[in-house]
Structure formats: structure tokens, C-alpha cells
Swiss-Prot record:
Lineage, broadest ranks: Bacteria, Pseudomonadati, Pseudomonadota, Gammaproteobacteria, Thiotrichales
Protein name: Thymidylate synthase
Function statement: Catalyzes the reductive methylation of 2'-deoxyuridine-5'-monophosphate (dUMP) to 2'-deoxythymidine-5'-monophosphate (dTMP) while utilizing 5,10-methylenetetrahydrofolate (mTHF) as the methyl donor and reductant in the reaction, yielding dihydrofolate (DHF) as a by-product. This enzymatic reaction provides an intracellular de novo source of dTMP, an essential precursor for DNA biosynthesis.
Residues annotated to bind (6R)-5,10-methylene-5,6,7,8-tetrahydrofolate: H51, D179, S273
Domain of life assignment: Bacteria
Keyword Transferase: yes
GO BP field: dTMP biosynthetic process; dTTP biosynthetic process; methylation
Quaternary structure, from the entry: Homodimer.
Originating species: Francisella philomiragia subsp. philomiragia (strain ATCC 25017 / CCUG 19701 / FSC 153 / O#319-036)
Length: 274
């Protein structure tokens, strides 16, 4: 994934030093796009190890509509715990907006599947996780926001759109805020996996995954890790094999996915900015 290393280098070379909500500080650019041909391998970063269970379980959790971390914790995925209440609640985050937008029964995922099957040339085949009604206040804690009925965090990956050409399904993600070192490799893998799943459900081949970022930043406490990653040579991409076709997009299980020949450099640890 040379494209991803080019992205990191571009931020380092062209970014502006900025403060941020977390107080950590960043080097930031505005606007960047990467394209991945899903026919040429699954875009899983190889210059460090990506924790595949976190990618898969989080996506299945989103698709379930859940906003409580219990399922994640039961599967040893703790990436959301910092923002959850003592009861594990995160408020109306991704899963709620995808499956029951604004609490009004609008299942955006089901609607996308139906449109892809019945109106594949539509330019309205998209899902929005951004709901201004529940965007949290930056003046209070995530847990206090949840108590007020808001999300613990606003969605970083805010909207994604689908497009069919030559019987191939492509997906474009718009990410308003992009943690280049920790978050973006994860997001690329997650939405590429979702594209494969929806393509299977709609009897389509996969096309491209296009990642579009708004505020793309490297946190100041990730610079050393980014330099280490840039020193590494990318390896061949793995391939994804889906072992069965469930009856719906909501019925996949972790065991349905096999990432074949995932060769990678060692993991690089870094602190998340809360």
C-alpha cells in the first residue's frame, strides 16, 4: 500500500502545525484522496500489523445497530472503551444512525441494499452517519454527552456512497477527521470489507474503494512512529475470502471472513488521543 505511505509523507511534508480538541497538537492538511482497486488485493496496511479482529468485530457491531461496547468487549475489542459510560453506552453513534437514523426507523443499510438491487444507476445510494441533532458538545465529556442523549463522539467517517459500473460495486468514504497513523488504515480496511460484503449480497463483483479525507492529521506524539513506518517497504496485499453467503447483510459472523496471505511488518504502538 504505497498509496498510504505517500499519504503519510504528504502530511509530513506539507502539513500545518495546529492545535486540536485533545490538546495533543497535530500536523494537518485539508483534503486528500486515495483509490484502491479491490480486484488487486485487499487494502490492509502491511508496513505494520493491523489487528484484524478489531476491524471485523467493529463493522459487525455497527451493522447490528448496537451502541453498547459489550459485544466488542466480549470479543476482546476495547477500542471504544475510553468514551463509553460505566454501563458501556456510547449514545447514538454509527450503528444507530446506520440502522435507525435519528430514532425514526430509517434503516439506511437496508435501503442501500434495496436500491443497489432495484435502482443501480441512482446517485442517491449513500449512508450518512452525520446527524446534527446528536453531535456532542466539546465543552463536556463524552459520558456527559451520552447522558444528554448525544453521541459520545461525532462520526469521523461521516458518509459513504456506492456506485455500480460494469457489474462492479465501488464505494467512496468521506472522512471529516482522519487520524492518519492510527485511524485511517483501520477505516480503509473496514469500508473495503463492507464493500465486499454488500457486493456479495447484491451478486456484484468488487470495484474500487475510494477514501476521501477532510482534516487529515498526524498527532505530535505519533511522529516517531510515522517515521518508522515510512522506513519500511510495503509487502504484497492479502486477499479476502468470504466463506459463505448469509441470507442478509446483517447475518455475517466473524468466522465468515478469511484474510489470506497477510504478510506484514511488526506492530507499531502509539497512544490514542481522547
Amino acid at each position: 500500500m504505497r498509496e498510504y505511505l505517500n499519504f503519510l509523507k504528504y502530511i509530513k511534508d506539507n502539513g500545518t502545525k495546529k492545535g486540536d480538541r485533545t490538546g495533543t497538537g497535530t500536523t494537518s492538511i485539508f483534503g486528500y484522496q486515495m483509490r484502491f482497486d479491490l480486484q488487486q488485493g485487499f487494502p490492509l496496511v502491511t508496513t505494520k500489523k493491523i489487528h484484524i479482529p478489531s476491524v471485523v468485530h467493529e463493522l459487525l457491531w455497527f451493522l447490528s445497530g448496537s451502541t453498547n461496547v459489550k459485544y466488542l468487549n466480549d470479543n476482546k475489542v476495547r477500542i471504544w472503551n475510553e468514551w463509553a459510560t460505566e454501563e458501556g453506552e456510547l449514545g447514538p453513534i454509527y450503528g444507530k444512525q446506520w440502522r435507525d437514523f435519528n430514532g425514526e426507523g430509517i434503516d439506511q443499510i437496508a435501503e442501500v441494499i434495496e436500491m443497489l438491487k432495484t435502482n443501480p444507476n441512482s446517485r442517491r445510494i449513500l449512508v450518512s452517519a452525520w446527524n446534527p441533532c446528536v453531535v456532542p458538545s466539546e465543552k463536556i465529556s463524552p459520558q456527559e454527552n451520552v447522558a444528554k442523549g448525544n453521541s459520545a463522539l461525532p462520526p469521523c467517517h461521516a458518509m459513504f456512497q456506492f456506485y455500480i459500473a460494469d457489474n462492479k460495486l465501488s464505494c467512496m468514504l468521506t472522512q471529516r477527521s482522519a487520524d492518519a497513523f492510527l485511524g485511517v488504515p483501520f477505516n480503509i480496511a473496514s469500508y473495503s470489507l463492507l464493500t465486499h460484503m454488500i457486493a456479495q449480497q447484491c451478486d456484484l463483483d468488487v470495484g474500487e474503494f475510494i477514501w476521501s479525507g477532510g482534516d487529515c492529521h498526524i498527532y505530535n506524539n505519533h511522529i516517531e512512529q510515522v517515521n518508522e513506518q515510512l522506513s519500511r517497504e510495503p509487502l504484497d496485499l492479502p486477499t479476502l475470502k468470504i466463506l459463505r453467503k448469509p441470507s442478509s447483510i446483517f447475518d455475517y459472523k466473524y468466522e465468515d471472513f478469511e484474510f489470506q496471505n497477510y504478510k506484514h511488518h511488526p506492530a507499531i504502538k502509539a497512544k490514542i488521543s481522547v
